[in-house]
Amino acid sequence: MALLLEYLPIIAFFVFYKLADIYVATGVLMVGTVLQILALKLLKQPITTRHWVILAVVMLFGAVTLLLRDDWFIKMKVSVVYVAIALMLLGGLIWKKRSPIQAMMGKDIKLPDTAWSRLTYAWIIFCLALAAVNLYIAEFWSQEAWVNFKVFGILGISLVFTIGTGFYMYHHAIDEETQD
């Protein structure tokens, strides 16, 4: 259920882009993102900082897109979100001296501190790379190509990177039974 809630706004965006246009799809994305937060609250699911950042950026860039009737702003939202995530991860490493990924997953998965740091830097680079690729596609490709990249390209690339992250974590996991 949580996975469906996670992707429902982007699925709705894609469907309404195909049925109408980028502006209708943007409005649907805005409403869908608000409904996502409300559903998480009703289902007593955790609402993370990432959810709030995405909500704020969707509302800001969506509103400007609709007010100015300029799709450039909603296209930039993707890059802004990925840069914000990269900055939050980097900020955690710099100011808290601890990987934010470790803070989220460290209770369940035991890795050496160096592995957590490398993993966090990998995610920072990944987010910045996605932001840059989005900027390129938004600027030089058609609107339809950008929508397809946003929905399918980013999802596919993220899935592959997440699977790679899982393999990395498995390879570096500390077996607590053999440590005793």
Curated annotation (Swiss-Prot):
Q: How does it sit in the membrane?
A: Multi-pass membrane protein
Q: Which domain of life is it from?
A: Bacteria
Q: Which UniProt keywords apply?
A: Cell inner membrane, Cell membrane, Membrane, Transmembrane, Transmembrane helix
- Could you tell me which InterPro entries the record lists for this protein? YciB (IPR006008)
Question: Where are the membrane-spanning stretches?
Answer: 10-30, 47-67, 74-94, 121-141, 151-171
Keyword Cell inner membrane on entry = yes
Role this protein plays: Plays a role in cell envelope biogenesis, maintenance of cell envelope integrity and membrane homeostasis.
PANTHER family, per the entry: INNER MEMBRANE-SPANNING PROTEIN YCIB (PTHR36917:SF1), INTRACELLULAR SEPTATION PROTEIN A-RELATED (PTHR36917)
State the protein's name. Inner membrane-spanning protein YciB
Organism placement in taxonomy: Bacteria, Pseudomonadati, Pseudomonadota, Gammaproteobacteria, Alteromonadales
